[in-house]
Design a protein with these regions (language model features):
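Cap/lid segment of the alpha/beta-hydrolase catalytic domain
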Residues: 1, 5-34, 217-220
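Structural recognition of the beta-strand scaffold that forms the well-ordered cores
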Residues: 5-10, 63-67, 75-77, 135-140, ...
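Gly/Ser-rich "nucleophile elbow"/oxyanion-hole loop immediately N-terminal to the catalytic nucleophile
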Residues: 23-38, 42-70, 85-91, 103-109
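Sec-exported extracytoplasmic/periplasmic mature domains
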Residues: 45-53, 80-85, 142, 198-202
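Surface-exposed patches in mature extracellular/periplasmic domains of secreted proteins
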Residues: 53-64, 149, 204-213
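Hydrolases whose catalytic domains are alpha/beta-hydrolase-1, hotdog thioesterase
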Residues: 71, 75-79, 148
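The feature captures the conserved acid-bearing segment of alpha/beta-hydrolase catalytic domains
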Residues: 98-205
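C-terminal catalytic histidine-bearing segment of alpha/beta-hydrolase fold enzymes
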Residues: 198-240
Length: 240
């Protein structure tokens, strides 16, 4: 009726905030987000396959947008930006044994597969052979593992975020949960993500759409006028 189709996707859950060490907590969280990215890409491939076989859901494969809230926001941003091995093996994503000095990636692609859900001894590939490209992502209260993941030429993105969120940081810093303490360090929230995406020119295409003068954007910008910082494309929502 409204001209678009919405799919509410499910993905694998499971991370352990009560793990014995910070490294294990961080690894658990990273693996959970990584698996969710794989599952979401599998879902996009499923819909593209269905499109070629009758299009049961009536989708337009030229206009696929991924949106998520909280953990789903992390998935959306990771979906758009993680596309090479070097990005998931940055020094902060490595576990160094205190006794032997052995270095182990927190994400072992030989075990759980790559970011598209291919390969891996313990991974089952779903709907191979179809594209899992999307055309835009929206994060609500999410974040990104490292700002270096963002590169010129990647898809547009927007974000909604509470500047004073006590768990999901708005700028760049640590992730901590009241019941578990520090989980991982130096991640970036919506403000810094959108600032870099805009600087790279990835969102330039959005300015041709109502040129930022639609009533929703104007209302969000007005509401954000007294917030802690503001970057085009990130809309600050109050917390209450």
């Amino acid at each position: 009726k409204r001209g678009y189709v919405v799919a509410n996707l499910e993905y694998r859950l499971g991370w352990n905030p009560a793990a014995a060490t910070q490294a294990l907590k961080g690894a658990s969280l990273m693996k959970a987000v990584y698996r969710a990215i794989q599952d979401t890409k599998s879902a996009v491939r499923f819909f593209r396959k269905d499109y070629e076989n009758g299009n049961t859901y009536g989708i337009d494969t030229s206009k696929i947008i991924l949106s998520g809230q909280g953990s789903g926001g992390w998935v959306a941003l990771g979906y758009a930006t993680v596309n090479k091995y070097e990005e998931i093996t940055l020094p902060k994503f490595l576990d160094v044994d205190a006794t032997t000095g052995a270095v182990t990636p927190l994400i072992d692609t030989t075990e759980i597969g790559d970011w598209d859900g291919y390969g891996g001894a313990m991974n089952m590939v779903n709907t191979p052979g179809y594209s899992n490209d999307v055309h835009m992502v929206c994060s609500m209260g999410g974040g990104i593992g490292d700002l270096s993941w963002l590169e010129a030429g990647e898809i547009p993105m927007c974000a909604v975020h509470c500047p004073t969120d006590p768990v999901a940081i708005y700028t760049t810093g640590n992730v901590s949960v009241p019941s578990a303490g520090l989980i991982t360090t130096e991640i970036s929230g919506s403000y810094d993500v959108m600032e870099k995406a805009n600087l790279l020119g990835n969102n330039d295409v959005l300015w041709a759409v109502n040129a930022g003068s639609d009533p929703y954007t104007l209302a969000a910008q007005a509401a954000s006028g007294t917030a802690v910082g503001k970057s085009d494309g990130v809309f600050d929502n109050g917390q209450g």
